[in-house]
UniProtKB/Swiss-Prot annotation:
This is DNA polymerase. It catalyses: DNA(n) + a 2'-deoxyribonucleoside 5'-triphosphate = DNA(n+1) + diphosphate. It comes from the Viruses. Keywords: DNA recombination, DNA replication, DNA-binding, DNA-directed DNA polymerase, Early protein, Exonuclease, Hydrolase, Multifunctional enzyme, Nuclease, Nucleotidyltransferase, Transferase, Viral DNA replication.
Length: 1006
């Protein structure tokens, strides 16, 4: 029997079992049940003394036990680490057992199961059926997994089954209550093992009149009275809410491979199961494959206490307890962990994922026709957009113009769409799927058949969006890749933090190297300095800036320094200068490089003036060996990715290389995380210390370098910053570039693992050509050991606001001057939620203007500053005088909560007063809009005081009175504060700001 493993899960009844859900080549699903064991590692002496004898025991052979407590010394008299060798046993017990002096107890039982039996969680195997006992059709028991799974075979493709779903619930203004508000719609995207895809929506007929129900039937909707009448081939089905819920129960109890929702663990699934129990007393029941255990669908929460005030909660995750092998997957939780976005609402995520450039085909009266294909954007972008458009109802044009779809024509690699849209002047626009321009509360207020059918379209689109996002993020291949890499079941891959997922690979390595790491002392946690961030040299750059990144800096630092808890010889600290001087002189004599590396770190305690960590590089440590394995595996899968021919292979190999990248980069963080099995304070701070020296070294050789006559003169000798080696340190290097090239280089910024180097050229093609040669020379001559850099991009018209805040046009290393550059806004207001649309529009306009000025190169920085400030004053005065912009541009939003440090917080007072005077109150957890409003007769106010008193909540009924105006000065001051931080002339900026607002601006820290 040839099978592929697709999920592992446990039952937690009186008799615990581990189950494998697998699939045969013919698509048949097979479950295999194993005994569940608790695992203990003991010495031979303890093993022989156990009474009663262990249930099962396996010899692990001779293993070396190393004490990894940190040795802190005020001199060089450092004691050797405690180390012993003994025969070890792995004990398996069906129930927990108290065994004294057991080691390696921090590892998961499931990881022990895989590793001790030689099983890969996502592997393909030819099973030896003599070790299988049939329980029922499709379910077997296995007591000897090692022999049953002895024959691993090449990977083969299998089909998967999915259920993507979304629900809509009646509500007015408040969040729906399961006790009051019925479910109006449930939409499903159902994909079976044959690949057949069904889309259907159930509409609650109890919210419609009998006349409307009859009209719906006349329009082609199916009306059913019971579960038995359900036809899944029909797109729209009318039924009572109880029938709707029973159909949901039937679907959720099926054994799909995946049930996928967006925030469904916290809302959709919880609402369905609670509403079902409330109306019928029934529960959704899952049964184990052997049919011996039944559990009710239940959502349980995992919380982590927040540091933000008493009782505050951060990072609450929701999980479904089930025992039938289905993976209940919440896209919301997954994307929160894997993507850094401004907002995690479904519309914002889909806007980020599904967008493409569209070409204007026709302009009509209040409508426009767009076409998108491989000629209007990068290959594949239009095809992905078109797929979502099949169910899409609204398209966002140019970031913020929301347009209803009138007609659409979709083909394999493109689309044509007619939108209800104001006439726009440009030939091309960015099209994306953002927020549908609908007010659900108002729709429920005006609810009728047409609205019900409209909502059905929105609901099925959201269900399908789950499928599109599932495919966009490659969740299935990432799940399999994670299971293989982390040695975890597919159902647990995304449930654990990095400190837990690293345990599987670590256990595997420790068993291979016959090593046990133990601590006898309590782990201590001290702060330490992070990566080096340079201050920007200037604000605006008319010349191009080359971006170089270290490849996997921290992993390679750990490998270079052999940083690991057991390779740490000790830490030498000093309390006075004399001690420090003596220690420095003797260190290199006793611990000479390159066998040893001494790392100068910031002192851990205020009474110390120096701290030096010493690492032995003669025998590779656990962390470097682990990292080398991860990086080698990543390189192997990247190579396989390039050679892959099928899309399935490409997806798998890309997910595998990405997973190894993530896990390698997480190791540094785990060294500094006290609850991690890899915790090593000295290693973590030594890692950042070496990283800082490496970025400073690269900056020092590039800052002031010159290219002429085919020769590159680096700014400093190419000396290893840690110890003398036999490399050529001559800073003059021959290049393969034309001899007529003459350019100078200047380092202008850097952050942790990247250096921004200005070249005195505005030619994109030459900049890319030179940067690629620089990359080669730096890797061959400047860097050493395993350190490598990569040329990432050319930044054109770079505007640096401050550290970690910049705007630029990015040309990637693979592009040229004819390529369309990508606009990058890092850490700026365009990416934030707490600024008004007016602010975002204006800052975007002024950054574009600055970029154009830099490109033209006709003005110096003073002239640019004068021109920008003069234009800004004109725009602000004009807006103040005309007062023509709508209130919507000045609205801000805020979440109402009670987790304030002060009980009389103005935000709380604002909502309390609003609720006193309005029947529709703002509840805790509800987001509300507000704006700054003042009396209309108030003249331009320079000095702004007590601005919170001008906050006014904006609801649907709010109208700006004739005696009121927007308090423009609040918005203008915030906007101007950001703009002056883009300009180089502080004197002019201060003068302008004082004249406009009566105070000096706040300049961002360099």
């Amino acid at each position: 029997m040839d099978v592929r493993c697709i999920n592992w899960f446990e039952s937690h009844g009186e008799n615990r079992f581990l189950y494998l859900k697998s699939r045969c080549r013919n698509g048949e699903t097979v479950f295999i049940r194993f005994p569940h064991y608790f695992y203990y590692v003991v010495t031979d002496e303890i093993y022989q003394s156990l009474s009663p004898p262990p249930f099962n025991a396996r010899p692990l052979g001779k293993m070396r036990t190393i004490d990894i407590d940190e040795t802190i010394s005020y001199n060089l008299d450092i004691k050797d680490r405690k180390c012993s060798v003994a025969d070890m046993w792995l004990i398996e017990e069906p129930k927990k057992r108290s065994i004294q002096n057991a080691t390696m107890d921090e590892f998961l039982n499931i990881s022990w199961f895989y590793i001790s039996n030689g099983i890969s969680p996502d592997g393909c195997y030819s099973l030896d059926e003599q070790y299988l006992t049939k329980i029922n059709n499709g379910c077997y028991h296995c007591d000897d997994p090692r022999n049953c799974f002895a024959k691993k075979i090449p990977r083969f493709d299998i089909p998967r089954s999915y259920l993507f779903l979304d629900i809509e619930c009646h509500f007015d203004k408040k969040f729906p209550s399961v006790f009051i508000n019925p479910i109006s719609h449930t939409s499903y995207c159902y994909i079976d093992l044959s690949g057949k895809r069904l889309l259907f929506t159930l509409i609650n007929e109890e919210m419609l009149t009998e006349q409307e129900i009859q009209e719906a039937v006349d329009r082609g909707c199916l009306r059913i009275q019971s579960l038995m009448e359900m036809d899944y081939e029909r797109e729209l089905v009318l039924c009572s809410e109880i029938v709707l819920l029973r159909i949901a129960k039937q679907l959720l109890e099926l054994t799909f491979d995946y049930v996928v929702t967006f925030n469904g663990h916290n809302f959709d699934l919880r609402y369905i199961t609670n509403r079902l129990e409330l109306l019928t007393g029934e529960k959704i029941i899952f049964r184990s494959p052997d049919k011996k255990e039944a559990v009710h669908l239940c959502i349980y929460e995992r919380n982590q206490s927040s540091h933000k005030g008493v009782g505050g909660m951060a990072n609450t995750t929701f999980h479904v307890n089930n025992n039938n092998g289905t993976i209940f997957f919440d896209l919301y939780s997954f994307i929160q962990k894997s993507e850094k976005l401004d907002s995690y609402k479904l519309d914002s995520i889909s806007k980020n994922a599904f967008s493409c450039m569209g070409k204007v085909l026709n302009r009509g009266v209040r409508e426009m026709t767009f076409i998108g294909d491989d000629t209007t954007d990068a290959k594949g972008k239009a095809a992905a957009f078109a797929k979502v458009l099949t169910t899409g109802n609204y398209v966002t044009v140019d970031e913020d113009i929301i347009c209803k779809v009138i007609r659409k024509d979709i083909w394999e690699n493109g689309f044509k769409v007619v939108l209800s849209c104001p006439t726009l002047p440009n030939d091309t626009y960015k099209l994306s799927f953002g927020k549908d321009d609908v007010d659900l509360a108002q729709m429920y207020k005006d609810y009728n058949l047409n609205i019900a059918l409209d909502m059905a379209r929105y609901c099925i689109h959201d269900a399908c969006l789950c499928q599109y996002l599932w495919e966009y993020y490659g969740v299935e291949t990432k799940t399999d890749a994670g299971a293989s890499t982390y040695v975890l079941p597919q159902s647990m891959v995304f449930e654990y933090r990095a400190s837990t997922v690293i345990k599987g690979p670590l256990l595997k390595l420790l068993l291979e190297t016959k090593t046990i790491l133990v601590r006898s002392e309590t782990k201590q946690k001290f702060p330490y300095e992070g990566g080096k961030v340079f201050a920007p040299k200037q604000k605006m750059f008319s010349n191009n800036v080359l971006i170089f990144d270290y490849n996997s800096l921290y992993p390679n630092v750990c490998i270079f320094g052999n940083l690991s808890p057991e390779t740490l010889v000790g830490v030498v600290v000093s309390t006075n200068r004399l001690e420090e001087e003596i220690n420095n002189q003797l260190l290199l004599q006793k611990y000479p490089p390159p066998r040893y590396i001494t790392v100068h770190c910031e002192p851990r305690l205020p009474n110390l003036i120096s701290e030096i960590a010493i690492f032995d590089r003669s025998i590779e440590g656990t962390i470097p060996r682990l990292l080398r394995t991860f990086l080698a595996e990543r390189a192997r899968y990247k190579k396989m990715l390039k050679q892959a021919t099928s899309s399935t292979e490409k997806a798998i190999y890309d997910s595998m290389q990405y997973t190894y990248k993530i896990v390698a980069n997480s190791v540094y963080g785990l060294m500094g995380f006290r609850n991690s099995a890899l915790y090593s304070y000295a290693s973590a701070k030594s890692c950042t210390s070496i990283g800082r020296r490496m970025i400073l070294y690269l900056e020092s050789v590039l800052n002031g370098a010159e290219l002429s006559n085919g020769m590159l003169r680096f700014a400093n000798p190419l000396s290893n910053p840690f110890y003398m080696d036999d490399r050529d340190i001559n800073p003059i290097v021959k290049t393969s570039l034309p001899i007529d090239y003459r350019f100078r280089f200047r380092s202008v910024y850097g952050d942790t693992d990247s250096v921004f180097t200005e070249i005195d050229s505005q030619d994109v093609d030459k900049s890319i050509e030179i940067a690629k040669e620089l990359e080669r020379l730096i890797n061959n001559r400047v860097l050493f050991n395993n350190f490598k850099i990569e040329f990432e991009a050319v930044y054109k018209n770079l505007i640096m606001q401050s550290k970690k805040k910049y705007t630029t046009m990015k040309y990637s290393a693979s592009s040229n001057s004819k390529s369309v550059p990508e606009r990058i806004n890092k850490g700026t207001s365009e990416t934030r939620r707490d600024v008004s649309k007016f602010h975002k529009n204006m800052i975007k306009t002024y950054k574009t203007r600055l970029s154009e000025m830099l490109s033209e190169g006709r003005m110096n920085s003073n002239q640019v500053c004068i021109d920008i400030l003069r234009s800004l004053e004109t725009d602000l005065r004009s807006e103040f005088d005309s007062r023509s912009s709508p209130l919507e541009l000045f609205m801000l939003s805020r979440m109402h909560h009670s987790n304030y440090k002060s009980a009389d917080n103005p935000n709380m007072y604002l909502v309390t007063e609003y609720n006193k005077n309005n029947p529709e109150t703002i509840e805790l957890g509800e987001r509300y809009y507000f704006a700054y409003i003042c009396p209309a007769n108030v003249p331009w106010t320079k000095k702004l005081v007590n601005i919170k008193t001008y906050e006014t909540i904006i609801d649907r009924s709010f109208k700006l009175g004739s005696d009121q105006r927007i308090f423009y000065e609040v918005y203008f001051k915030r906007l101007t504060s950001e703009i002056v931080n883009l300009l180089d002339n502080k004197v002019l900026c201060i003068s302008f700001f004082e004249r406009m607002f009566g105070s000096k601006p706040t300049f961002y820290e360099a």
